[in-house]
Regions:
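A cross-kingdom feature that marks ATP-driven nucleic-acid transaction machinery
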Residues: 1-108
């Protein structure tokens, strides 16, 4: 977003940047994951630890499959998260957890 500039209506992009910077602060190397046509927002690696993260503004019935599907396609046992601004929603789908982005940022 530093290259294309900031747009007020790009909340999802701002959230992604925030998560990216937090992962770097925690000592992870961060990449984007791609498997076939599915893309994972972040693949974070640190020593023997790996974390897969999807970031979205709000989980809705319309976008839940889109956010979880790329993580479901990964067959290893590393932690997989969908981060959103939802505060009451707590989805656990096949071991993939939805977590509030603020709660994630306040960890560690």
């Amino acid at each position: 977003h530093a290259v294309i500039g900031y747009r007020d209506n790009d909340i999802a992009g701002v959230l992604e940047n925030t998560v990216f910077l937090e992962l770097l602060r925690r000592g992870f190397s961060v990449n984007i994951g791609k498997q076939d046509v599915a893309e994972v927002d972040f693949v974070a690696n640190r020593a023997d630890d790996r974390l897969y993260i999807q970031v979205c503004y709000i989980l809705t019935p319309e976008n839940t499959d889109r956010e979880f599907a790329p993580l479901e396609a990964i067959s290893d046992n590393y932690e997989k998260l969908v981060l959103s601004t939802d505060t009451l929603l707590r989805v656990n789908r096949g071991g993939i957890r939805q977590k509030n982005i603020i709660d994630f940022l306040l960890e560690h």
